[in-house]
Regions:
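Charged, compositionally biased N-terminal leader segments and the immediate start
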Residues: 303-321
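C-terminal amphipathic alpha-helical segment
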Residues: 210-212, 217-228
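Residue-level signal for inorganic ion chemistry
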Residues: 326-327, 424
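C-terminal non-catalytic interaction appendages of large macromolecular assemblies
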Residues: 405-471
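Catalytic alpha-helical scaffold of carbohydrate-active enzymes acting on polysaccharides/glycoconjugates
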Residues: 2-203, 229-253, 259-302
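A structural motif
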Residues: 197-216
Length: 471
């Protein structure tokens, strides 16, 4: 069983990003060109469009044209697009178009204007519709048609992909084509990242639904240009400061011709562009520029081990002895569900410890009893040690004791086990013999309950050290 969501991402280990000219932030504007590709009886759909318009809360009209809705979308193509085009060309700011293929096919003049401005035209799918109920086969068919129609409408195959209203299969289907330099059906980070796909590593450049004018057309959204400006400014300020502090990020801004192309909303963009241009070291980029930069300076790297990609046998074989002679812990972790977050010793340790902590005290005691005595002098028992235990004890100097030292350890082991009913357990890595002996004597004074908890914590520490060796 696998849980496909990666809830860790880069975590505390963000890559050291150096944008071109050492910019503190990459600012990326997307204009979604959807007009003419939305739900409409004229397009062969069963109902009218209801999404992202001035009519907040609109419902589809089955079997009927919604003339007002069509007219609102028409505004985006007829007027809104050109207003945005004038703004960005005048400011010399590059743009990525997310172009719905059937919309582009109906707008050759607008497409020509995009190309003359040297904007990137990425694919936004075949139609601007809801895909949530599509079968994998049908979605693949629409994807292939989107590429074909896009190529015919623009003269070039798209290098980027963003469907928007997709399914759990969208990213995999787009990736398996091998056609896209990046995919943007993701909202989970402020930086690009690589994923494992069927054919080769796939670059993901996350998009945004917060710094997005769509919130003018949703409940609890923006209702004035100043609100949109304030939100964009706040986002920019935080990310720019992070860049100054040494951790540059990417700021996505999502726009729609029929929304931001309205005069009252364009003011937000004008003021925001003016504001950002008052700062040094801002990189205005197309998404394809970011993709090419990332591919060059942050290429995919092969992981030493990748737990998420392991079979059950591989996972248990690799992690079965992380908790001494207790492969059931790894088995339970696998059964609960591997996930992509298991990319570091810290993450994998957390998932394995969860299973150990969920166990009953009786099960935990079995794990404690699976650990060897320290400084074993019984050859037969020594031969039963796991490789990890042998190396750990050797590293602490417990395999080369004098007769006097051996006698002292034997006596302490015997007394401790008589009192607590399990071996003395301590993560010996980095500790000297004298430190271990001191802890032996201190912990002997604990109550059984306190020592049981202490021993369990030491088991977890040992597990972490073992995992670090693997990663």
């Amino acid at each position: 069983m696998k849980y496909p969501r990666d809830l860790l991402g880069y975590g505390q280990n963000s890559p050291k990003v150096v944008w071109p000219k050492r910019a503190k932030i990459a600012v990326q504007f997307v204009i979604n060109y959807e007009e003419g590709g939305e739900n409409c009886l004229l397009h062969g759909d069963s109902a009218s469009e209801s999404f992202l318009s001035e009519i907040v809360g609109a419902e589809p009209w089955p079997g009927k044209r919604h003339f007002n809705m069509e007219s609102i979308y028409d505004y985006g193509a007829r007027s809104g697009f050109w207003r945005l085009h004038r703004l960005f060309t005048a400011e010399s700011i590059p743009v990525t178009i997310f172009g719905v293929a059937t919309a582009l096919a109906k707008s050759p003049v607008q497409v020509n204007a995009m190309q003359l401005a040297q904007w990137e035209i990425a694919s936004h799918g075949l139609k601007w519709i809801e895909y949530k109920n599509f079968s994998k086969k049908k979605e693949r068919s629409f994807l292939q048609k989107a590429i074909k129609v896009h190529t015919a409408a623009t003269g070039l195959a798209p290098k980027g992909w963003y469907l928007g209203r997709g399914t759990e299969n969208t990213v995999a289907l787009a990736s398996e084509t091998g056609s896209f330099e990046y995919i943007s059906d993701s909202y989970d980070d402020d930086l690009p990242y690589w994923i494992t796909s069927k054919n080769a590593p796939q670059l993901i450049i996350p998009y945004t639904l917060d710094a997005n004018d769509m919130r003018f057309a949703t409940q609890q959204g923006f209702n004035s240009w100043s609100q949109f400006f304030d939100y964009l400014k706040g986002t920019f300020d935080v990310l720019y400061k992070e860049g100054v502090e040494g951790s540059p990020k990417m700021m996505n801004i999502g726009l729609h011709c029929r929304l931001s192309g309205r005069p009252g909303r364009l003011m937000a963009l004008k003021e925001f562009i003016k504001y950002t241009k008052s700062f040094k070291d801002v990189w205005y980029a197309k998404r394809i520029d970011i993709a090419e930069h990332w591919k060059k300076y942050h290429p995919p790297c092969e992981k030493k081990i990748n737990p998420y990609q392991m079979t059950k046998g591989q996972f248990i074989g690799t992690f079965g002895n992380i908790f001494e002679h207790s492969p059931w812990i790894a088995e339970k972790a696998y059964s609960r569900g591997l996930n992509p977050s298991m990319k570091s010793p810290e993450a994998t340790h957390g998932f394995l410890c969860f299973e150990f902590r969920m166990a009953s005290d009786k099960e935990k005691l079995k794990v404690l009893k699976s650990h060897p005595d320290l400084a074993l002098d019984n050859k037969k028992l020594v031969e039963k040690l796991t490789t990890s235990s042998t190396l750990e004890q050797k590293g602490a100097g417990l395999t080369s004791l004098s007769d006097r030292q051996q006698k002292e350890f034997n006596q302490l082991n015997h007394q401790y086990k008589e009192k607590f009913k399990h071996p003395f357990i301590i993560a010996v890595k980095g500790k000297t013999r004298s430190q271990i002996l001191r802890q032996f004597k201190i912990r002997y004074e604990n109550s059984r309950a306190d020592e049981f908890m202490t021993a369990c914590r030491e088991v977890e520490k040992i597990a972490y050290f073992r995992l670090k060796e693997l990663f």
